[in-house]
């Protein structure tokens, strides 16, 4: 499907695409939509479970699917709007439920926030498209194992011990979570020093991107790409006393945290200066959840798995507390991040969501 700010390219690539899951032979009046910054959500794991319960489910992708290095938030929101409009205008849906899942939580929160009360500013050096002021709003909001925001999760996972952003092996071992002399368990003093240094790393990268854009502009260039290393270093991965939950300790989404941290596999590995400012910068990005959640005033449900190794109880509480809706609830349930365990976890979460909607007579 085309978007208000992009059309099909010469190779046939459509900016927006997805799969609409429905019960056989029916046209549901209530449908869900889920989108991620980068991950292909067209076959999202919740889709068949909620279709079995009588709902439509649009697993939707923007032009940045698999290509977050070039993400610009305002255009991602316009692409999501194409999916929401399709549900209302073509699929015959009367009410739409947003699903903010995993890293897509802050993206969908930003969408509903902008649809409710236009607020985002243009990415540095760009202009906002007119279409971003005409986003159809949705009727309900579900947050499921959602990160608090793209800049927030990156900073929480940052390894602040890296001393040279161009050298993934460079390390200040006095600040490394993998130095046994520091823990685990980690002392309150080390935790404070570590988190301050994580914030400082984000700020340094923001300053570098801003300065680099100015340097490139003077040279007649618009942007550049760069790599960012060492992003599997949240202290909570090795210290279960921090933000305690039922999660296994010593495990991250990519397996062993130390091995993952020193591998090229990590969130935000490649960005341009401009996309980094749009998505990852604490100072500049509009991909932080809390400011957007304040504007969401529709009925809202927050569900969090207790064995999640990347989203923690404090994240779920922060999301719930930030939501502007007076009609909101927070539920914890057994399960890992993707609800692959225990058996029946996906059925359970689908039942919880369906039961919550039943309370509104839909």
How should these model regions be labeled?
Residues 22-66:
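Short, surface-exposed "cap/lid" segments of acyl-processing enzymes
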Residues 296, 302-304:
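Short beta-strand/loop motif that positions the catalytic acidic residue
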Residues 86-89, 94-166:
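Primarily recognizes the serine-hydrolase "nucleophile elbow" in alpha/beta-hydrolase
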Residues 172-291:
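Alpha/beta-hydrolase
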Residues 152-153, 285, 309-315:
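Conserved alpha/beta-hydrolase "acid-adjacent" motif
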Residues 63-97, 345-349:
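Catalytic nucleophile-loop/oxyanion-hole region of alpha/beta-hydrolase
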Residues 1-30, 342-343:
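N-terminal cap/lid segment of alpha/beta-hydrolase-fold proteins
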Residues 335-348:
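Catalytic histidine-centered segment of alpha/beta-hydrolase-like enzymes
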């Amino acid at each position: 499907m085309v978007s208000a700010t992009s059309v099909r390219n010469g190779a046939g690539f459509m900016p927006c695409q997805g799969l609409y899951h429905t019960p056989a032979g029916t046209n549901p009046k209530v449908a869900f939509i889920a989108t991620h910054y980068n991950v292909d959500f067209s076959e999202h794991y919740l889709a068949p479970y909620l279709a079995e319960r009588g709902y439509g489910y649009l697993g939707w992708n923007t032009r940045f699917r698999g290509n977050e290095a070039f993400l610009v938030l305002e255009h991602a929101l316009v692409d999501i709007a194409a999916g929401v409009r399709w549900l209302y205008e073509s699929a015959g849906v009367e009410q739409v439920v947003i699903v903010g899942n995993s890293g897509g939580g802050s993206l969908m929160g930003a969408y509903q926030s902008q649809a409710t009360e236009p607020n985002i500013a243009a990415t540095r050096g760009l202009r906002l498209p007119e279409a971003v002021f005409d986003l159809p709003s949705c009727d309900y909001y579900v947050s499921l194992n959602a990160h608090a925001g793209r800049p927030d999760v990156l900073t929480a996972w940052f390894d602040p011990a890296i001393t040279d952003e161009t050298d993934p092996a460079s390390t200040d071992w006095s600040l490394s979570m993998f130095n046994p002399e520091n823990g685990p368990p980690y002392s309150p003093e080390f935790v404070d020093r570590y988190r301050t240094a994580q914030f400082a790393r984000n700020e340094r990268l923001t300053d570098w991107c801003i300065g680099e854009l100015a340097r490139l502009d003077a040279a007649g260039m618009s942007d550049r790409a760069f790599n960012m290393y060492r992003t599997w270093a949240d202290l909570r991965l090795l210290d279960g006393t921090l933000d305690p939950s039922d999660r296994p300790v010593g495990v991250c989404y990519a397996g062993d945290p130390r091995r993952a941290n020193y591998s090229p596999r990590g969130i935000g590995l490649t960005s341009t200066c401009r996309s980094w400012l749009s998505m990852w910068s604490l100072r500049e990005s509009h991909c932080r959840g809390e400011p957007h959640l304040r504007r969401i005033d529709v009925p809202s449900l927050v569900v969090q798995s207790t064995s999640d190794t990347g989203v923690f109880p404090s994240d779920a509480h922060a999301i719930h507390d930030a939501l502007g809706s007076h009609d909101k609830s927070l539920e914890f349930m057994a399960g890992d991040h993707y609800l692959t365990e225990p058996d029946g976890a996906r059925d359970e979460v689908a039942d919880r969501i369906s039961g919550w909607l039943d309370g509104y007579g839909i």
